[in-house]
């Protein structure tokens, strides 16, 4: 999908012979849409498509199969993701399927971007049947050794230096993620993680204030027991409690709660057992909230 900037967004579609209800999926920071599918036919996107859904997996600008890839000349950030990339993806699904109900699934920071989009463009709320967020948090308040290493050391010290040297954040080369971020997107997301204020640095739009005035679609917040930093269960709950009025469901994937494993931030979507464990519950949730 071409953007006015000249960039091209990739929207990967997984569907059966007769497309079912549409599901739009959005990845988080320092990653791309491959968190939802693999070349070997695994992943939540493929699982849902095999069970009757018409699935669209987005790669935000410069990530995954979108082009051109992020480099030192890239000037966009999460403001553009919220105001340009996500609207383009939503409208693409509408153009293909008509103005029918969509359901949205996100991993990590993708949930923050989806909620920010709905806060800024509430006219789209009526289009969304439900939201499913895996490991989505906006702030990190938990304290442990992994937080010190991954956030206080790597995210707040190593990443700014890498941005200065490379002109962007080469997360894959640093082995802290699967895709790159621009300097702007890094700085904007880092500010939201650190501060209570949920405000756009470009124009001052107050997402936190706007979202409190809205009734969002039913939302399922899924955390993982072994996600110690990037989507700690307490931080996921904090995001849920700050994200407006909605029918809420909160789950921690753990052996204690009947799951096969104590999953982490990535394996909650990539573990081979997920298809037998919690993916069927996600499938049932989406079926229950499909109002066609």
What are the roles of these predicted feature ranges?
Residues 1-16:
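N-terminal cap/lid segment of alpha/beta-hydrolase-fold proteins
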Residues 15-69:
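Short, surface-exposed "cap/lid" segments of acyl-processing enzymes
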Residues 75-94:
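Alpha/beta-hydrolase active-site loop
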Residues 95, 99, 104-105, 109-202:
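Alpha/beta-hydrolase-fold enzymes
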Residues 206-215:
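The feature captures the conserved acid-bearing segment of alpha/beta-hydrolase catalytic domains
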Residues 221-223:
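Short beta-strand/loop motif that positions the catalytic acidic residue
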Residues 228-235:
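Conserved alpha/beta-hydrolase "acid-adjacent" motif
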Residues 248-292:
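Catalytic active-site module of serine/aspartate enzymes centered on a nucleophile-bearing elbow/loop
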């Amino acid at each position: 999908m071409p953007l006015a900037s000249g960039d091209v967004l990739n929207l990967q579609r997984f569907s059966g012979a007769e497309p079912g209800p549409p599901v739009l999926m959005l990845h988080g920071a320092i990653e791309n849409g491959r968190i939802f599918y693999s070349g070997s036919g695994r992943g939540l996107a493929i699982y849902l498509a095999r069970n009757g859904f018409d699935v669209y997996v987005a790669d935000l600008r410069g990530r995954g199969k979108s082009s051109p890839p992020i480099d030192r000349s890239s000037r966009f950030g999460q403001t553009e993701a919220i105001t340009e990339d996500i609207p383009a993806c939503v409208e693409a699904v509408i153009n293909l399927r008509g103005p029918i109900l969509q359901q949205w699934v996100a991993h990590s920071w993708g949930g923050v971007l989806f909620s920010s989009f709905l806060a800024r463009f509430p006219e789209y709320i009526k289009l969304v049947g439900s939201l499913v967020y895996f490991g989505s948090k906006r702030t990190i308040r938990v304290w442990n050794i992994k937080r010190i290493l991954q956030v206080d050391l790597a995210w707040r010290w190593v990443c700014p230096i890498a941005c200065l040297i490379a002109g962007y954040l080469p997360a894959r080369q640093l082995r802290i993620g699967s895709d790159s971020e621009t300097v702007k997107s890094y700085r904007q997301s880092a500010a939201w993680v650190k501060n209570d204020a949920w405000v756009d640095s470009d124009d001052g739009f107050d997402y936190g204030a706007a979202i409190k005035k809205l009734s969002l679609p039913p939302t399922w917040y899924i955390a993982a027991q072994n996600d110690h930093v990037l989507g700690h269960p307490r931080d996921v709950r904090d995001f849920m409690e700050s994200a407006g009025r909605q029918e809420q469901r909160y789950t921690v994937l753990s052996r204690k709660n009947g799951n096969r494993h104590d999953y982490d931030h990535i394996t909650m979507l990539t573990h081979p057992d997920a298809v037998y464990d919690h993916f069927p519950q996600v499938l049932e949730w989406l079926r229950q909230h499909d109002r066609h």
